[in-house]
Amino acid sequence: MPIGVPKVPFRSPGEGDTSWVDIYNRLYRERLFFLGQEVDTEISNQLISLMIYLSIEKDTKDLYLFINSPGGWVISGMAVYDTMQFVRPDVQTICMGLAASIASFILVGGAITKRIAFPHARVMIHQPASSFYEAQTGEFILEAEELLKVRETITRVYVQRTGKPIWVVSEDMERDVFMSATEAQAHGIVDLVAVQ
């Protein structure tokens, strides 16, 4: 039996009465938000608008992005990453469960020293994929060129944010590389593993 989105009590400062709001709205007010699904245009636009709104509201208080995602659309994920770099407050990233593919790219985009993984979290990096098998020959060539540019960008970001040499990152991106929380820390994708 689905329970829907739970409601929780919330009292605004200066108000006497408590109102019931859905749990996500309550957490947003505390600057906490979640990527708990596949990354697509809709979820990336929601995360981007939240980050921008909250940074306008108060630009000195950190934002917290909790991640449990199998990945998704590369360009949508890159838009979330770019926004994290653009907004003034630090964005702390917390991996709980899985940060795979473009979700690991978002994870590594958190403020340096403020990227965390829960002890049993998993992180997976790999090269961006495409739908070559569906394309005509001319489209295939154009798409391959674009995919190479995207791969170079993603590789460059991982190198910059992890401190690993380009050859290590390039080699790791050749296949699906799964890491435990401590392995992700050693790889420079997260800075801390939360203690139990």
Curated annotation (Swiss-Prot):
Location of the active site: 101, 126
Q: Which reactions is this enzyme annotated as catalysing?
A: Hydrolysis of proteins to small peptides in the presence of ATP and magnesium. alpha-casein is the usual test substrate. In the absence of ATP, only oligopeptides shorter than five residues are hydrolyzed (such as succinyl-Leu-Tyr-|-NHMec, and Leu-Tyr-Leu-|-Tyr-Trp, in which cleavage of the -Tyr-|-Leu- and -Tyr-|-Trp bonds also occurs)
Query: Does ATP-binding appear among the keywords?
Result: no
Q: Which Pfam families match?
A: CLP_protease (PF00574)
The record's annotation in Gene3D superfamilies points to: 2-enoyl-CoA Hydratase, Chain A, domain 1
Q: Which GO terms describe its biological process?
A: protein quality control for misfolded or incompletely synthesized proteins
Question: Which Gene Ontology cellular component terms are annotated?
Answer: chloroplast stroma; endopeptidase Clp complex
Cellular localisation: Plastid, Chloroplast stroma
Which InterPro entries does the record cross-reference, listed alphabetically?
Answer: ClpP (IPR001907), ClpP/crotonase-like_dom_sf (IPR029045), ClpP/TepA (IPR023562), ClpP_His_AS (IPR033135)
Role summary: Cleaves peptides in various proteins in a process that requires ATP hydrolysis. Has a chymotrypsin-like activity. Plays a major role in the degradation of misfolded proteins.
The similarity comment for this entry is: Belongs to the peptidase S14 family.
Subunit relationships:
Component of the chloroplastic Clp protease core complex.
What is this protein's name? ATP-dependent Clp protease proteolytic subunit
- Organism, by scientific name, is Nasturtium officinale (Watercress)
